[in-house]
C-alpha cells in the first residue's frame, strides 16, 4: 500500500473502475427494494458552482448509503437545458444557443465525473433535445383535448423600439436592457394550463407529504391560498350595469365607503371616455408593474371615476375609484373598501379625503381608529340588523341575506392562478398548436410531432428566430395550409416531468408505465427552498396530470424532500478611480488581519489594493466570490471537497466556505490513510476473539459499535451528515491512541477500519474504495453491506464515575455496571484523593447521577 495519500491518482483509478464496470447503471428488479434518489438537475451554464456541488454531494451520500443497505438505487442526472441565459450568451458570443448549450453540457459532465458522483449516465437526458420535448408536446395536446389548456390575452413586458417581448429579467429600472427604451405592458394571446382545476387536491395532499419540510408545505399552502368568502353584486347608480366583488370579510360590508376597481376594469374604461384625467391614469397604469411584491410597497394612487356603486344591502351610493393597487387578473378586478378595518383602504381614504366609518369593535377594550384601521375580528356595531354579532355570526347572517335576495353567493376562492406557459422566446420547446386558414386553432397532429426547434439560427438580440422566419411557421394539416404557434414553452414545463422520464429515458412513449411505477415516487428529492412555490408546485401538479392520464399510479412525485442551504463565501471590494466598486475574488486576497474575535480588520489583494470586507455572502458572479470547485478538486481532491461540504454545516443551513476548513478535511483523510497504511504493514493474521478482550479493548470496541449506531441513524434517519462525520472523527482519535501491540489490539483496529471505510464511503467514496481493497477485502465496497452494530459490544461490564467534592473533580473510579448507589458511595469515599479532601470536614449531602457522577458536599 502507498504510504502517501495521492488523491488525483486514486480518484482517476476508482472513477475508471466505476465507468468500466457500469457500477451505477441499474434496471428494475422485483426482488430488491428500490430507492430513487434525485437532485434537481442543473442548468448547463458552463461551469459547476459550489451550490451544485453541495446539492449533488448530499444526493450522492444518500444514494450510496442506501446502496449499502442492499437497495436497488437509481440516481440519474440530466440537463435543464432550455432558457434565456443561452440566448443572451449566444448573442454575446456570436453563436447559436444550441452549440453553446451542448458544449457546456460536455464540460459540466466531466466536472461531475471528477467529483465522483455515482450517476447512472445511461439515463442522461437534455431537455433541449427533440427526443425529450416531443413527449412534452404530445402531453400538451392531450391536456388540450381534455379541456385543461386554453388561450387568453395576458399582459407582457413590451419594448416598443425593438418591438419584442422582454422577460422580467430583461427589464432594468423600467427600461429595455438592450436599448434603454421605457417598457410598456402589452396584452397578447397566450396559452394557459388549468392548474386551478387541481387547486383543492394540491392543497389537501400537502397533508400527505410527511417527508417534506414544514416551511415548504406552509409556502405552498399560502401560494395556493384557499379562502372562504362571499361574492356579491354591486349595482351602478343611474345605469343597468353591475359588477361583482369577492371578500373574505363580509362582516365589514356595512362599513364600505368607496369601491376600488382596476384601471383595466370595463367600468374604468367606460368612465374614461368622458374623463381625461382618468384616461391618463389608465395609460400610466398599463405600463406599471403587476407583481404582488411591488404592489405592496409602491405608492397607492387613484382617480375618481365619477360613477357610484349601490351597496347591496343598504342601497346607499358609494364612489367608485380606479386604483393602481387593484389588478384585473386577480379576483374580479374590484374590491370593496372599508377604511375603518383595512390599513391599505385607510391610507387611501386619508390621502383622498374619503369617509372612514367603523363597524367592528373589540370584544374587550376601546376602539380607536384615529391613527390606523382596526383590522382584527370583533363585534359588529353601526351595522343595523347585524349589530352585536361576532365574525362567524355576521359572516353567516350577511351571506344568507345576500343569497336570499339574489345579490350574492358563498364562494371558495384560490390565490393560485392558471399557469401561463407561453414564452415569446426562441430557446424553448415549440408549443404544438397550429392555426388553420379559417382561423381555427387545433393541436399539431400526433404524426407531426415533435415540432422541432431549428438549432442553426442567428441571434440578433431582438426577435426570436422562429418569429422572424415567416417560412418556419408555415405547415400543412390534413392538406390545409396552417401556421405554427411561434411561442415556446415556459422552461418550468421541462422540469415538471423530467424525474419521470428518467425511469424510461429511451422509451418510444412519454413513460413506460411498468418502469415508471417500479421507480416512482422519488424516495429522496434534493434542491433549494427557492423552488418551493414554482417548480415544486408544478412538479406535484404534473404528477397528478400523469396519474390522471394513466401513466403513473401514485398521487405525489416525491416522498421526502431535503432543501439544502446556500453556500456563502467572504466578499471583498475596493473602489476604483471612477468611484465604482471592483469585487475581488477571495482567492486573490493575499493578506488579512483579524481582531481577537476573528473579524477581518484589514485585507489586501495581490495587486496591493486595500480592500473593504463585506462579510460572508452567497457565492455569486456579481460579488466575484464564487470558488471554482474544479480548482479545489485539483488542489485537494474530490473526497476532500465532498467531506468539507458534509462536515461544515447541517444540510438545511447555510454553509460558510472556509479554505482552512477544507485543509482540515484534507488532514483528516491523510490521518485515516496513515492509520490504514500502518495497520496493513503489520501482521494482522490473528482473528478477533471477543472472549479474550481486556476491559480496555472492550471499551475501544464499544466506541466502534456506538459510532456505527450513531452514523447509521445520522445519515439514514436524521440526515445530519455533519454529526455523522464528527462521530467518525471522534472514533479516529480513539483509534490513533490505541495500542497495536497484541494480535487482539490489531484485530480491533482491523474491525474498526473495515467499519470506518464503509461509514465514510457515501462521503469519501474514492478513499473508501481504495482502503477497502487494501484492508484485504476481495469484493468491491459497492457490493458490501453497511456495518451492523454488535449489540453485545455495547454492553458495559463497568462504568467510570466522576467524583466531585464541593463541585470540583477530585477522582475517577471504576465500578461494576450494575453497582447500586451505596456501593458507589462506599468506593468513592474510600478513594485516597477523596479522603484527602474530606479530612476535617463534615459530609452534608451526597448526590449520585447513575453511571456518571458522585457529588459530595462537605464543610
Swiss-Prot record:
Cellular compartment(s): Cytoplasm
Enzyme class: ligase
Any one Pfam family match given in the protein's UniProt record, by short name: tRNA-synt_1g
Reaction catalysed by this enzyme: tRNA(Leu) + L-leucine + ATP = L-leucyl-tRNA(Leu) + AMP + diphosphate
Motif stretch ('KMSKS' region): 618-622
GO molecular function: aminoacyl-tRNA deacylase activity; ATP binding; leucine-tRNA ligase activity
Residue numbers covered by motif 'HIGH' region: 42-52
Cystine pairings recorded for this chain: none
Keyword set, alphabetical order: Aminoacyl-tRNA synthetase, ATP-binding, Cytoplasm, Ligase, Nucleotide-binding, Protein biosynthesis
Protein name, as recorded: Leucine--tRNA ligase
Amino acid at each position: 500500500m502507498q504510504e502517501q495519500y495521492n488523491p488525483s491518482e486514486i480518484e482517476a483509478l476508482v472513477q475508471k473502475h466505476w465507468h468500466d464496470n457500469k457500477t451505477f447503471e441499474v434496471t428494475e428488479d422485483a426482488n430488491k427494494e428500490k430507492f430513487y434518489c434525485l437532485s434537481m438537475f442543473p442548468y448547463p451554464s458552463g461551469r459547476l458552482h459550489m451550490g451544485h456541488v453541495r446539492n449533488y454531494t448530499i444526493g450522492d451520500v444518500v444514494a450510496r448509503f442506501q446502496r449499502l443497505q442492499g437497495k436497488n438505487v437509481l440516481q440519474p442526472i440530466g440537463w435543464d437545458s432550455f432558457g434565456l441565459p443561452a440566448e443572451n450568451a449566444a448573442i454575446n458570443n456570436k453563436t447559436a444557443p444550441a452549440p453553446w448549450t451542448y458544449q457546456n453540457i460536455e464540460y459540466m459532465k466531466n466536472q461531475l465525473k471528477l467529483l465522483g458522483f455515482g450517476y447512472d449516465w445511461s439515463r442522461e437526458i437534455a431537455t433541449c433535445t427533440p427526443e425529450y420535448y416531443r413527449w412534452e408536446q404530445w402531453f400538451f395536446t392531450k391536456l388540450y383535448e381534455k379541456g385543461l389548456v386554453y388561450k387568453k390575452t395576458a399582459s407582457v413586458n413590451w419594448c416598443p423600439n425593438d418591438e419584442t417581448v422582454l422577460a422580467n429579467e430583461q427589464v432594468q429600472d423600467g427600461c429595455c436592457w438592450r436599448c434603454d427604451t421605457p417598457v410598456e405592458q402589452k396584452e397578447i394571446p397566450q396559452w394557459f394550463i388549468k392548474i386551478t382545476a387541481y387547486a383543492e387536491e394540491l392543497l389537501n395532499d400537502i397533508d400527505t407529504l410527511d417527508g417534506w419540510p414544514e416551511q415548504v408545505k406552509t409556502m405552498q399552502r399560502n401560494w395556493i391560498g384557499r379562502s372562504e368568502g362571499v361574492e356579491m353584486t354591486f349595482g351602478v347608480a343611474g345605469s343597468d350595469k353591475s359588477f361583482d366583488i369577492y371578500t373574505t370579510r363580509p362582516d365589514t360590508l356595512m362599513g364600505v365607503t368607496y369601491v376600488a376597481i382596476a384601471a383595466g376594469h370595463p367600468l374604468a374604461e367606460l368612465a374614461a371616455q368622458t374623463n381625461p384625467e382618468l384616461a391618463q391614469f389608465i395609460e400610466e397604469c398599463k405600463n406599471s408593474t403587476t407583481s404582488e411584491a411591488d404592489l405592496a410597497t409602491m405608492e397607492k394612487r387613484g382617480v375618481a371615476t365619477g360613477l357610484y356603486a349601490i351597496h347591496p344591502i343598504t342601497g346607499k351610493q358609494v364612489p367608485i375609484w380606479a386604483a393602481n393597487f387593484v389588478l384585473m387578473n386577480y379576483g374580479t378586478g374590484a374590491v370593496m373598501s372599508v377604511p375603518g378595518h383595512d390599513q391599505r383602504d385607510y391610507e387611501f381614504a386619508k390621502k383622498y379625503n374619503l369617509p372612514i366609518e367603523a363597524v367592528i369593535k373589540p370584544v374587550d377594550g376601546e376602539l380607536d381608529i384615529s391613527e390606523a384601521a382596526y383590522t382584527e375580528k370583533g363585534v359588529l356595531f353601526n351595522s343595523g340588523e347585524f349589530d352585536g354579532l361576532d365574525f362567524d355570526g355576521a359572516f353567516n347572517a350577511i351571506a344568507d341575506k345576500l343569497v336570499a335576495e339574489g345579490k350574492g353567493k358563498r364562494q371558495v376562492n384560490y390565490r393560485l392562478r392558471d399557469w401561463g406557459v407561453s414564452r415569446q422566446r426562441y430557446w424553448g420547446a415549440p408549443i404544438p398548436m397550429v392555426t388553420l386558414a379559417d382561423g381555427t386553432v387545433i393541436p399539431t397532429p400526433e404524426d407531426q410531432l415533435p415540432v422541432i426547434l431549428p438549432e442553426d439560427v442567428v441571434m440578433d438580440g431582438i426577435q426570436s428566430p422562429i418569429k422572424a422566419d415567416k417560412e418556419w411557421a408555415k405547415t400543412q394539416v390534413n392538406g390545409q395550409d396552417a401556421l405554427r404557434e411561434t411561442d415556446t414553452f415556459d422552461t418550468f414545463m421541462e422540469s415538471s416531468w423530467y424525474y419521470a422520464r428518467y425511469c424510461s429515458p429511451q422509451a418510444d412513449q412519454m413513460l413506460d408505465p411498468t418502469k415508471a411505477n417500479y421507480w416512482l415516487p422519488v424516495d429522496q428529492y434534493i434542491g433549494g427552498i427557492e423552488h418551493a412555490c414554482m417548480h415544486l408546485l408544478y412538479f406535484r401538479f404534473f404528477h397528478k396530470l400523469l396519474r390522471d392520464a394513466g401513466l403513473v399510479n401514485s398521487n405525489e412525485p416525491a416522498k421526502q424532500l431535503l432543501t439544502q442551504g446556500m453556500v456563502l463565501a467572504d466578499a471583498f471590494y475596493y473602489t476604483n478611480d471612477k468611484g465604482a466598486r471592483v469585487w475581488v475574488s477571495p482567492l486573490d486576497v493575499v493578506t488579512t488581519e483579524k481582531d481577537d474575535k476573528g473579524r477581518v480588520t484589514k485585507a489586501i489583494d495581490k495587486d496591493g489594493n486595500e480592500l473593504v470586507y463585506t462579510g460572508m455572502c452567497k457565492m455569486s458572479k456579481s460579488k466575484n466570490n464564487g470558488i471554482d470547485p474544479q480548482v479545489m478538486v485539483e488542489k485537494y481532491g474530490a473526497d476532500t471537497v465532498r467531506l468539507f461540504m458534509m462536515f461544515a454545516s447541517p444540510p438545511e443551513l447555510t454553509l460558510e466556505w472556509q479554505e482552512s476548513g477544507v485543509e482540515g478535511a484534507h488532514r483528516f483523510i491523510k490521518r485515516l490513510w496513515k492509520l490504514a497504511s500502518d495497520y496493513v504493514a503489520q501482521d494482522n493474521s490473528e482473528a478477533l476473539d471477543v472472549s479474550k478482550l481486556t476491559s480496555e479493548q472492550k471499551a475501544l470496541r464499544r466506541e466502534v459499535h456506538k459510532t456505527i449506531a450513531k452514523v447509521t441513524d445520522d445519515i439514514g434517519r436524521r440526515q445530519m451528515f455533519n454529526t455523522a462525520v464528527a462521530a467518525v472523527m471522534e472514533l479516529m482519535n480513539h483509534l490513533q491512541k490505541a495500542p497495536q501491540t497484541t494480535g487482539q489490539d490489531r484485530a480491533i483496529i482491523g474491525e474498526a477500519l473495515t467499519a470506518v471505510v464503509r461509514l465514510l464511503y457515501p462521503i469519501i467514496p474514492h478513499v473508501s474504495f481504495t482502503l477497502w481493497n487494501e484492508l484485504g477485502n476481495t469484493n468491491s465496497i459497492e457490493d458490501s453491506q453497511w456495518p451492523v452494530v454488535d449489540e453485545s459490544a455495547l454492553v458495559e461490564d463497568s462504568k467510570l464515575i466522576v467524583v466531585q467534592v464541593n463541585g470540583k473533580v477530585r477522582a475517577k473510579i471504576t465500578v461494576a455496571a450494575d453497582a447500586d448507589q451505596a456501593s458507589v458511595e462506599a468506593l468513592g469515599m474510600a478513594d485516597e484523593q477523596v479522603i484527602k479532601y474530606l479530612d476535617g470536614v463534615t459530609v452534608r449531602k451526597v448526590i449520585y447521577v447513575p453511571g456518571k457522577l458522585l457529588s459530595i458536599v462537605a464543610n
